[in-house]
Amino acid sequence: MKLDKYTVGRRYGKALFELAIDSNSAEEIYQELLSLRQIYSEIPGLGNVLSDVRLEPHEKRIIMDKLVSGFDGIVKNFLEVVYSYNRMSELSFMIDEYEHRYNDYKGLLLGSVKTAVPLSDEQLQKLEMNVAKTMDYQTVELKQIVDSSIIGGAIVEANHRVIDGSIRTQLEKMRNQLNR
């Protein structure tokens, strides 16, 4: 059975994170993975090229050697394992999973807040503190998204949860109740 890219990303990311914790190097590995993510964003399609069966193995090896030369230890070995299993096209999902686990480990929750108008720094800080308390995290960082179509209120998305306090949703609920 072929695994989808999300399952592959979760498995490899989890394994790398557990190894990082065991070796007491979670922060260093995280920083190296951020560098790797940057390389992948600067060279779109790099993972697909390294996973392409039409490319000669020695050609891929040249590219791979250049890529791993910037990394040491665990990350270098991890890249070699991922390459040997022909999974370089799923590397960004592995990095995402590692980052999610790393943030959980640090007590940090990343999310977004959608509002009709921009929030002041003070409002955003209060909202982040409330979300941290509600979702039981030490720290929350919310990225602001302005969307006037929600009319008012806020929609917070974090950790696969949505807290919808928008006026638009409240009006839709009222309309549905009146139409019954």
UniProtKB/Swiss-Prot annotation:
Protein localization: Cell membrane
Membrane topology category: Peripheral membrane protein
PROSITE patterns membership: ATPASE_DELTA
Keywords: ATP synthesis, Cell membrane, CF(1), Hydrogen ion transport, Ion transport, Membrane, Transport
Pfam families tied to this protein: OSCP
Main location class: membrane
Family of the protein in this entry: Belongs to the ATPase delta chain family.
Function: F(1)F(0) ATP synthase produces ATP from ADP in the presence of a proton or sodium gradient. F-type ATPases consist of two structural domains, F(1) containing the extramembraneous catalytic core and F(0) containing the membrane proton channel, linked together by a central stalk and a peripheral stalk. During catalysis, ATP synthesis in the catalytic domain of F(1) is coupled via a rotary mechanism of the central stalk subunits to proton translocation. This protein is part of the stalk that links CF(0) to CF(1). It either transmits conformational changes from CF(0) to CF(1) or is implicated in proton conduction.
Name the UniProt record assigns to this protein: ATP synthase subunit delta
Source species of the chain: Enterococcus hirae (strain ATCC 9790 / DSM 20160 / JCM 8729 / LMG 6399 / NBRC 3181 / NCIMB 6459 / NCDO 1258 / NCTC 12367 / WDCM 00089 / R)
Gene, per the UniProt record: atpH
